Amino acid sequence: MPHSNISSTPRQQLTERVLQAKAANNLTWASLAEDTGLSVVYVTAALLGQHPLPQAVAEVVAERLGLDRDAVVELQTIPLRGHVEDVSSDPTIYRFHEMVQVYGTTLKALVHEQFGDGIISAINFKLDIRKVEDPEGGERAVITLDGKFLPYKPF
């Protein structure tokens, strides 16, 4: 039976334990997600407190991290999502806020022009990030946001 958190505290505390264990065991997000059948993005988001994990995956990941049975149960609990304090103070996260501030109205206009009145789902959603070489030198981040379009329906 699925359980749900009504406070962000349990997942925040577990996230701290996950980060400590990840560092202590010299693990990567990719190594934690390996052979789980889930994407590295989804497993990372779950371990950072934004998604529940299926029982089998929670058990595998907890074992890799050396976490106890209580952590396995908490990893399966539906979290209070999006409840992250002070996200705008982190420079990396703030750049994403800045991108939406600058391009949000453009994205909205183009989505509506191409799809009509509606939204892009963050529930039926996939996210991918990859590093590519920049022809002008250095590296670039290619971030793909892949969400299902959900039209508004008159009633």
Curated annotation (Swiss-Prot):
What Pfam families does this protein map onto? Cyanate_lyase, CYNS_N
- EC assignment: the record states 4.2.1.104
User: What top-level branch of life does the organism fall under?
Assistant: Bacteria
Is Lyase found in the keyword set?
A: yes
Q: What keywords sit in the KW lines?
A: Lyase
Note the CDD domains from the entry.
Cyanase_C (cd00559)
State the Gene Ontology BP annotations.
cyanate metabolic process
Reaction catalysed by this chain?
A: cyanate + hydrogencarbonate + 3 H(+) = NH4(+) + 2 CO2
Identify a single GO molecular function assigned to this protein: cyanate hydratase activity
Q: Which residues form the active site?
A: 95, 98, 121
Q: Known PANTHER family for this protein?
A: CYANATE HYDRATASE
Family of the protein in this entry:
Belongs to the cyanase family.
Functionally, this protein is described as follows: Catalyzes the reaction of cyanate with bicarbonate to produce ammonia and carbon dioxide.
What is the name attached to this protein's record?
A: Cyanate hydratase
Source organism of the structure? Pseudomonas syringae pv. tomato (strain ATCC BAA-871 / DC3000)
Taxonomy of origin reads: Bacteria, Pseudomonadati, Pseudomonadota, Gammaproteobacteria, Pseudomonadales
Q: Which gene encodes it?
A: cynS
